[in-house]
Amino acid sequence: MKPVFVILFLTCIAFTYAESYEDVKEEIKNEVEREIFEDLEEESDVLDSNVREFNDAKPWRFRRAIQRVRWRKVAPYMPFVVKTVGKK
């Protein structure tokens, strides 16, 4: 809710000090763009830190190896493996 109140406050200031409607529109647009860029920078910093933590974790190696398996290539051989294991 804070960004909403900030934008509304800046809008009120813009209305009181603006010379024309076009100036108000331009000022609001600039403020909104600035807020969006700041939020994106913060989110990218958070994502970068999460990626580093995930890549540094050694216990995840097995899970990543399983995720990399091409299941479409392996799936046709699964019934044969199940039959072979079931016979023993």
Swiss-Prot record:
GO cellular component: extracellular region
Subcellular localization(s) per the UniProt record: Secreted; Target cell membrane
Prosegment location in residue numbers: 19-57
Signal peptide segment: 1-18
Expressing tissues: Expressed in entodermal epithelium along the body column.
Keywords: Amidation, Antibiotic, Antimicrobial, Immunity, Innate immunity, Membrane, Secreted, Signal, Target cell membrane, Target membrane
PTM-bearing positions, type Valine amide: 85
Main location: secreted
Claim: Secreted is one of the keywords in the record: yes
Family label: Belongs to the arminin family.
Job description of the protein: Antimicrobial peptide with a broad-spectrum antimicrobial activity. Keeps its antibacterial activity under a wide range of salt concentrations that mimic physiological conditions of human blood, which is surprising, since Hydra is an obligate freshwater animal with nearly no salt tolerance. Does not affect red blood cells.
Protein name per Swiss-Prot or TrEMBL: Arminin 1c
